[in-house]
Amino acid sequence: VSSQKIEKIDKMFLDGLISKIDELIAKQLDEILHDETFQEIESLWRSIDYLVDKTDFRANIKLELLDVNKQALIDDFEDASEVIQSALYKHVYIDEYDTPGGEPFTSIISPFKFDAGAVDLALLKDISKVASAAHCPFLGNVGAQFFGKKTMSEVVKIEDIENYMEKAEYIRWNSFRDSEDARYIGLTAPQFLLRLPYGENNPVGSFQYQESVNGETSKEYLWGKATFALAANMTRSFKENGWCVNIRGPEGGGRVENLPLHQYNVGQGLQTKIPSEVLLSETRELAMAELGFIPLSYYKNSDFSCFFSANSTQKPKRYDAFDAT
């Protein structure tokens, strides 16, 4: 055993070293958590957790997880000579809807985000045929890319969105909307906030970590697809009413409640980050609904958002007589 005298440890110096280590770990964690691929994985699992947590399974509700990504679904339809030969058709229609004793699906909830390109619209068309055959609506999502923009903030700045959607880029989209099976497709937007950034109000527990986010943008925050919020409202409606139709309006089952509100310092006080990618005006919400989308609108100065409508992608038929329309 050494008889060398140990100098007194400087506690402040040691605390400083520990603080620097925490800072280095925090920077590494920021890079991981804000990586696009990691965000997609975390968003998916937290969205599933959100739906499971909001579902009362004592109300005869079942959730089935199907492990398939968007590209695999595209390949499934491309490899099949026709839709009825696809694996999705077999699983949803043949194995359940068309089999005695089977348990038909009420709806298919997906995290998939669609754009207005040929590949995605071909996929939506194939899915709509399966959904129509099994009377099982399919829910997907659209983002800024659908509208040819980089962010949803740019989308809400489109002045005449009805005229904008008549551009040549949306010929396939408008053709799809005219199809009969389009009534079995629902596309939601924008996304909602899944969790607060880690820090004082959402501590990690094992060490001091303050997640670095820019409150003026949306990139570093963790967003969830609105399909899962709508699905949670559907399960709640089924529990309370025995069916899934009470899912619209603040008093009619459309609320998405208790959303996280992040407050950040802007130098002259605290600013609140709304739990939605963008704030939709009533006029914009109505316009998007009439264009075949299901908008999730944040209720200003509150902690909830709301689905005011639940339109399918199908374009309503117009007749000479108003009552017929």
PLM regions and their residue ranges:
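Well-ordered, non-membrane alpha-helical segments in soluble/globular domains
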Residues: 44-45, 79-93, 119-130
